[in-house]
Amino acid sequence: MALRRTSDSKVYLPPTPVSRVVRRMNMYTHRIYYYAGSSRLLTLGHPYFPIPKSGSTAEIPKVSAYQYRVFRVHLPDPNKFGLPDPQLYNPETERLVWACVGVEVGRGQPLGVGLSGHPLFNKLDDTENSHLATANADTDNRDNVCVDNKQTQLCIIGCTPPLGEHWGVGTVCKNAQSQVQRGDCPPLELISSVIEDGDMIDTGFGAMDFTALQATKCDVPLDINQSICKYPDYLKMSADTYGNSMFFFLRREQLFARHFFNKAGTIGDSVPVSMYIKGAGQGREPPTTSIYSRTPSGSMVTSDAQLFNKPYWLQRAQGHNNGICWGNQLFVTCVDTTRSTNLTISTVSAQSASATFKPSDYKQFIRHGEEYELQFIFQLCKITLTTDVMAYIHTMNSTILENWNFGLTLPPTASLEDAYRFIKNSATTCQRDAPAQPKEDPFSKLKFWDVDLKEKFSIDLDQFPLGRKFMLQAGIQRRPKLGTKRPASSLSASSSSTTRKKRKLTK
C-alpha cells in the first residue's frame, strides 16, 4: 500500500510569544480628577521668514500658520502632591501617575485665509490655458505668484514628541556602477525625525527637504523654499510598542489644484522619442518642458468644520499607553491653517506725506499672530511596583525609576580610602567633592513651547468650563456649597416652639 509523505526539508515552528505590554487597565484608578489650564498663549512674527538683527531693529521670529505648534506641558509630580487622602497609596511599593482623560485646545482670532507666494516664482507656461508651446526656456520667465496653501487642522496628544517624515537626500553605495555626477538627480531617502515647534507642515508641495533638493530657490513659496516640510509619521507612531508618542489624533485636510504650470530649465529626464511624433516647427520642435506643477488651494474655511474649541474625552487610546503621562509631561501638537490671516501694516516713511498718493512715501509690513489656550482633565492612577512592571518601565525609560528614587545600592567599597586631618590649609591638597551633575533633559536640544502647569492644578472641577463639561458627561455631582442659612434642625425647633405658643394663646 502506497503512502504519501510530506517533504521533510522544512519544519514550521510556532512564533515566539510577544512580550506583554503593561496597560492602564492593570493599574488602579481613583475617582480623583484634577483640572489644569494654561493662560492665553500668544505668538507674533513674520509669516514668511525670520528677520535678523540689523542696527536698532530687533530680531523678529518666523511665525506662520503653516508651522507646527508643539507644546511641552510640564505637570507636577503626583508623589509629591498634596492629596486629599494620604492613605491613597503606599510609598514603599506603589507610585502615583497622571492619566489624561480630557483635553480642549482653544483657538482665538477670526477665521481667515492667509496667502503665501514668491515674487520670482519659477513659472514658464500656463499649461491649463496654453495655446502654443514655448520651447525657449533660456530667458528668465519667473513671475510673481501667490497661492492659498493646503488647509490643515491637526491635533496630536502624547507623552513623547511626535514623529514626522520627509524625503531627503540619500546616500550612494560605494560599489555602485554609476556614481552621481554634478547635475544628476540625487538618490532619495525617507527620513523620520522628531517634529519640533516651528517646523513647517506640508503646504501642498510635498513633504521634502527643499533646501537640499531645490537649488533654484523659486519652485515653491518663500515660507518653505529654505525649509523642511514634515508630515506626521502616523504609521510609525501607531506601530509604537509603548504608544507614548500618540494617544490619539485629530486630523482634517483639504486641498484642490488651482493653477497648472510647467517649470523652466533643462530637462534632466527627457521624454523618449517613441512617446510622441515630432512636430513641424512652430514652437513644437523640440518640445517644451514636461515638468508640470500645480498651485494648491485650501478653499473655503468655515466654522462648521472646526476641530478646536471642543472638548475630547479619552476612554481608550489606540496604543498600549492609555493616556498615562510618563515623566510628568505631555506633548500637544497643533496645526490650524483656518486662522492664517496675515496682518498688513503700513507706516509713513517720508517726513510729510503728499496730498496725492505716492507709494514711496509709505512702508508696508506683514505680520502673523496666533492665540492658543490648553485645558486638561487629569485622573490620579496608582501603580504597584512589581518586578515585571519595574522591568517594563526600565526598558521603556530608565529615568522614570530614577526620578522615583529607585536605583541600585552599591556595595561598600573594600579599598582603603585617604582621610586628611587638616583640610583647609595650603599644605593639603583640595578635598572638595566634584559637584553633582544636573539631570540631563533628553529633549534639551529640541525646540518646544514650554507650558508649566505645576502650580495650576485644581480639584474644584465645577469652577472651570471644561471641568463642568466633564462632570456632566461623567455623571459626577457637584459638591454642596456652603450657605448662610441656618441648619434644618434649628428651623424645625423654632417652628415647633412657635406653634406651641400659638396653641397656648388660643386656649
Swiss-Prot record:
Assembly with partners or alone: Self-assembles into homopentamers. The capsid has an icosahedral symmetry and consists of 72 capsomers, with each capsomer being a pentamer of L1. Interacts with the minor capsid protein L2; this interaction is necessary for viral genome encapsidation. Interacts with protein E2; this interaction enhances E2-dependent replication and transcription activation.
List localization entries: Virion; Host nucleus
List the keywords (alphabetical): Capsid protein, Disulfide bond, Host nucleus, Host-virus interaction, Late protein, T=7 icosahedral capsid protein, Viral attachment to host cell, Viral penetration into host cytoplasm, Virion, Virus endocytosis by host, Virus entry into host cell
Would the keyword Disulfide bond turn up in this protein's UniProt record?
A: yes
Q: Please report which protein family the annotation says this sequence is part of.
A: Belongs to the papillomaviridae L1 protein family.
- The main place the protein resides is virion
Organism of origin is Human papillomavirus 69
Where on the tree of life does the source sit, at the highest rank? Viruses
Q: What does this protein do?
A: Forms an icosahedral capsid with a T=7 symmetry and a 50 nm diameter. The capsid is composed of 72 pentamers linked to each other by disulfide bonds and associated with L2 proteins. Binds to heparan sulfate proteoglycans on cell surface of basal layer keratinocytes to provide initial virion attachment. This binding mediates a conformational change in the virus capsid that facilitates efficient infection. The virion enters the host cell via endocytosis. During virus trafficking, L1 protein dissociates from the viral DNA and the genomic DNA is released to the host nucleus.
Family matches, as InterPro entries: Capsid_L1_Papillomavir, Capsid_L1_sf_Papillomavir, dsDNA_vir_gr_I_capsid
Q: Which GO terms describe its biological process?
A: endocytosis involved in viral entry into host cell; virion attachment to host cell
GO cellular component terms listed in the entry, alphabetical order: host cell nucleus; T=7 icosahedral viral capsid
Q: What HAMAP family does UniProt report for this protein, alphabetically?
A: PPV_L1 (MF_04002)
Q: Does the keyword Transmembrane helix apply?
A: no
Q: What is this protein called?
A: Major capsid protein L1
Give the residue ranges for region: Disordered. 477-507
Q: Where is the composition biased (Low complexity)?
A: 488-498
User: Listed GO molecular functions?
Assistant: structural molecule activity
